[in-house]
């Protein structure tokens, strides 16, 4: 409706962006989303080295990473949908973080105890993406809820911050940690 339209005046837009990008709750939720996704994205950026060098997988074997990861994303998303309306968003996020934390601890323990090998080196990635996908929808809503009249603008800011963090991961952090499966973990 015309009454709910936002003006495109530069001063109004600058204030609106400032309001969103200086909100501590928004920035905290965006950081959570970025770091959660970053725990998986680091493997995406390191996939050729992780799979081919560390695990000895051929060029045609990238399913070993992306198959379990996608299954984790889909099943976690399904569970998050089942949680909706039954438990609070914060409870859903807490469960997602518990799963991601367990996956991370398991990943580090496996890399300390065993040499890199399939399927053990990718199993924690399935569990991590499962937990990430459980938490992500509720965390996204928490980041957008403070701005009911400007959800699109807030979503745009959220994706801008996420993309910037992904760029940092891809260009700086991934090359620093892909030297071993333990540093990736």
Describe each model-derived feature in a short phrase.
Residues 2-30:
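Juxtamembrane intracellular "pre-TM" segments in multi-pass secondary transporters
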Residues 22-42, 126-130:
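Pair of pore-lining "gating" transmembrane helices in MFS-fold secondary transporters
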Residues 45-61:
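Short amphipathic helix-loop junctions that connect adjacent transmembrane helices
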Residues 59-67, 156:
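Small-residue hotspots at the loop-to-helix junctions and early N-terminal turns
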Residues 64-73, 162:
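Transmembrane alpha-helical segments of major facilitator superfamily
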Residues 75-91:
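Helix-to-loop junctions at the C-terminal end of transmembrane segments
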Residues 91-139:
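C-terminal transmembrane helical hairpin of 12-TM major facilitator-type secondary transporters
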Residues 130-133, 139-182:
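A late C-terminal transmembrane helix in Major Facilitator Superfamily
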């Amino acid at each position: 409706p015309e009454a709910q339209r936002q003006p495109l005046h530069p001063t109004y837009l600058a204030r609106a962006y400032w309001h969103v990008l200086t909100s501590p709750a928004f920035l905290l939720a965006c950081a959570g989303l970025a770091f959660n996704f970053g725990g998986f994205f680091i493997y995406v950026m390191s996939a050729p080295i992780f799979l081919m060098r560390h695990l000895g997988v051929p060029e045609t074997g990238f399913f070993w990473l992306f198959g379990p990861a996608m299954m984790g994303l889909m099943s976690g998303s399904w569970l998050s949908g089942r949680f909706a309306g039954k438990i609070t968003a914060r409870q859903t996020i807490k469960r997602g973080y518990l799963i991601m934390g367990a996956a991370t601890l398991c990943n580090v323990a496996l890399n300390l105890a065993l040499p890199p090998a399939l399927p053990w080196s990718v199993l924690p990635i399935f569990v991590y993406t499962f937990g990430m996908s459980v938490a992500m929808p509720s965390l996204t809503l928490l980041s957008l809820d403070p701005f009911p009249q400007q959800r699109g603008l807030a979503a745009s800011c959220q994706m801008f911050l996420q993309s910037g963090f992904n760029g940092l991961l891809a260009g700086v952090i991934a090359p620093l940690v892909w030297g071993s499966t333990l540093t990736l973990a």
